[in-house]
Amino acid sequence: MLCKNICAMSTYSESFERRVEDTLCGATVREQAAEEERLMKKPPTGDPAHDVLGYEKRSLDAIFRATSVAVIGATDEASSVGRTVMRNLINNPFGGTVYPVNPNRPSVSGIKAYPSVSELPEPVDLAVVVTPAPTVPGIMRECAEAGVQGAIVISAGFKEAGEEGVDLERQVLEEARRGRIRVVGPNCLGVMSPKSGLNATFAGAMAKPGNVGFLSQSGALCTAI
């Protein structure tokens, strides 16, 4: 599923996630998501008051409830998107694990970097992609092979850049569908979940936790609000 040019900020709730899917995905993807939920639902334990194992995993959990994130294109270069995204993830109260992925650097922000997603020490829930547009289809294929379930493609240079970009975006969508990866982007600000401390954006500040979920087609408007 490809959600084009979306910035999302949420305190995260199941009802919000369902509204996101209803708004962005369309009937075909909703049907696919319903089937995924049916397959992933664990049998109840028999005690509704303590039915922890009865939780239904939803297809957007990999984004809004991510516990591990790979930043593909993370770097220490000043004023770069890769540096800002990395800093936003590690400087906010996100309780998960963050892995920088960059084949040209041994470490980023003092954290060991890995050459590729396939070489990470564990599968990750979410990949945040900030590499040049021509590299993204291959990265999406690699993410699918590594079992990544959610991706945020911040990279620009797709449909908005002309015919070549249209073809690149089509390739990204094909790889995402093949790997059953939920995608926000490309050419987007990213996703914030203030309640969980996840700031997978290049925005200058983290939103405060609250009771409102916010989606914007415009990254500038999202940042301003």
Describe the predicted segments one by one.
Residues V20, G26-A27:
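Residue-identity detector for glycine
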Residues E35-I225:
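Catalytic-core regions of core metabolic enzymes
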Residues K4, E21, Q32-E36:
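Charged/polar low-complexity intrinsically disordered segments
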